[in-house]
Design a protein with these regions (language model features):
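Active-site phosphate/pyrophosphate-handling residues
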Residues: 72, 145, 182
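Short, electropositive alpha-helical surface patch
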Residues: 174-186
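A short acidic, helix-capping loop that chelates divalent metal ions and anchors anionic groups
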Residues: 37, 74, 130-136
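Conserved N-terminal beta1-alpha1 strand-loop-helix module at the mouth
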Residues: 1-91, 96-122, 149, 155-159, ...
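Substrate-recognition "cap/lid" segment bordering the active-site pocket of phosphatases
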Residues: 135-150
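Residue-level detector of alpha-helical segments with a strong bias toward transmembrane helices
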Residues: 137, 173-174
Length: 206
């Protein structure tokens, strides 16, 4: 069961020099209820240590923790789930290894989204919806029209819009029929992450 609508993805390079855990805690205090730990430049040992700290923090706020790609670390720290992508372990293999973990999947087309859910993913992120530096490698944004199509053709309630989503364009996302979003910078880089998280929750009606 996906019991969150605002999905925060970490990037400690976007916190303006503030400690990542401090910024994430502020976001949690503002209402974030799911965090994906995504720090790809860390060694496995460093990521493991940070994951334990993030697990303790999210547990205090009764929030979900998912680990990007590393199902071994997700299991080791008793995270709630793992987030996979096209170059990760296949969804079907992850489900065999960890039948009780939440599995998220990064999709960049309607076909990818539908296929991932059919293979056992619990939810998908879909994008990039708008231009964003963090998703430049995936080419041009898919746009709001494709997001709307993804929500119609996949199970709409299991699709999180991703990529360049900010408080000032959130209404366009919900108008496309998407009431779940994943994001990085508009919370992590905000002067007040708690206030930013609260604004997103209000905009999503959650």
């Amino acid at each position: 069961m996906i019991d969150f609508s605002l999905y925060l993805i970490t990037d400690r390079n976007q916190t303006g020099g503030r400690p990542l855990l401090e910024v994430v805690e502020a976001a949690l205090s503002g209402g974030v209820r799911a965090v994906q730990l995504r720090e790809k430049d860390l060694t496995p040992a460093e990521l493991y240590d940070l994951a334990w700290e993030m697990r303790a923090l999210t547990s205090r706020y009764d929030a979900r923790l998912l680990i990007n790609e590393r199902i071994d670390i997700a299991l080791a720290v008793e995270a709630d789930g793992v987030h996979l992508g096209v170059n990760s372990l296949p969804v079907t293999a992850a489900r065999r290894i960890a039948p009780d973990l939440l599995i998220g999947y990064s999709s960049h087309s309607v076909g990818e989204a539908v296929a991932a859910l059919a293979k056992g993913a619990d939810f998908v992120t879909f994008g990039p919806v708008f231009p964003t530096p963090s998703k430049a490698a995936y080419g041009e944004p898919v746009g709001l029209g494709e997001l709307e199509r993804a929500c119609r053709q996949a199970v709409g309630d299991l699709v999180f819009g991703l990529g360049g989503i900010k408080r000032d364009n959130l209404a366009q996302v919900t108008a496309a029929g998407c009431y779940r979003v994943a994001l990085i910078s508009d919370i992590l880089a905000a002067p007040d992450p708690a206030e930013a998280a609260g604004a997103f929750r209000r905009g999503l009606g959650c």
